[in-house]
């Protein structure tokens, strides 16, 4: 019976040894890969973590400093990274719809109203639409073709020839001209 027990213990020792070898191999692989990444500087997350740590130390130092009173300096807003920003962006942009100069902080709400989009939009005439209508009116005072039936040139086609292809009817249908009609 001692042979069977020796056999079981040798199997247990063998399986334990194989397991320990596998664990050692995995640890060596992970350690060598981490060393390679750190040595070559390939770990970008490490730079991000170091930058966040530096910024948090600076922010704690600013908060702990009694001479740095954030309430007295209301001209600029300090974000969580310690950077100062003006309360409303002061850069000026030209509206591509109406041509007005708009401060950057009000540009998006202005564009919603100006272009007639968004929840607060309303249909209104802007300078650009008025200018476009004036340009179109000056371009051709007497158009050759008009889709409206009461115009002076209602029987002319886009080419300028008289209405040969079709005849305009009062009920908005087109009747073809056929010989013998």
UniProtKB/Swiss-Prot annotation:
Question: A single GO CC term, please?
Answer: DUBm complex
Q: Does the keyword Flavoprotein apply?
A: no
Q: Which GO terms describe its molecular function?
A: zinc ion binding
Predominant location category: nucleus
InterPro entries xref list: SAGA_su_Sgf11
Gene3D superfamilies (alphabetical): Classic Zinc Finger (3.30.160.60)
**Which residues lie within the region annotated Disordered?**
116-181
The free-text function statement in the UniProt record for this protein reads: Component of a deubiquitination module (DUB module) that specifically deubiquinates monoubiquinated histone H2B (H2Bub). Does not seem to be a component of the TREX-2 complex. Seems to act independently of the SAGA multiprotein complex. The DUB module is responsible for the major H2Bub deubiquitinase activity in Arabidopsis.
- Protein name (Swiss-Prot/TrEMBL): SAGA-associated factor 11
Organism phylogeny = Eukaryota, Viridiplantae, Streptophyta, Embryophyta, Tracheophyta
């Amino acid at each position: 019976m001692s042979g069977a027990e020796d056999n079981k213990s040798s199997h247990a020792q063998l399986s334990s040894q194989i397991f320990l070898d596998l664990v050692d191999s995995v640890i060596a692989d992970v350690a060598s890969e981490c060393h390679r990444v750190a040595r070559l500087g390939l770990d970008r997350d490490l730079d991000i973590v170091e930058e966040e740590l530096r910024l948090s130390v600076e922010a704690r130092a600013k908060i702990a400093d009694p001479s740095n009173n954030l309430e007295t300096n209301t001209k600029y807003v300090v974000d969580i990274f310690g950077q100062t920003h003006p309360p409303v962006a002061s850069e000026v942009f030209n509206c591509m719809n109406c041509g007005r100069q708009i401060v950057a902080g009000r540009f998006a709400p202005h564009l919603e109203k100006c272009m007639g989009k968004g929840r607060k939009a309303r249909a209104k005439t802007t300078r650009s639409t008025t200018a476009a209508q004036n340009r179109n009116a000056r371009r051709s005072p007497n158009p050759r073709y008009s889709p409206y039936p009461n115009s002076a040139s209602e029987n002319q086609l886009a080419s300028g020839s008289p209405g040969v292809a079709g005849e305009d009817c009062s009920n908005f249908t087109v009747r073809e001209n056929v010989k013998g009609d």
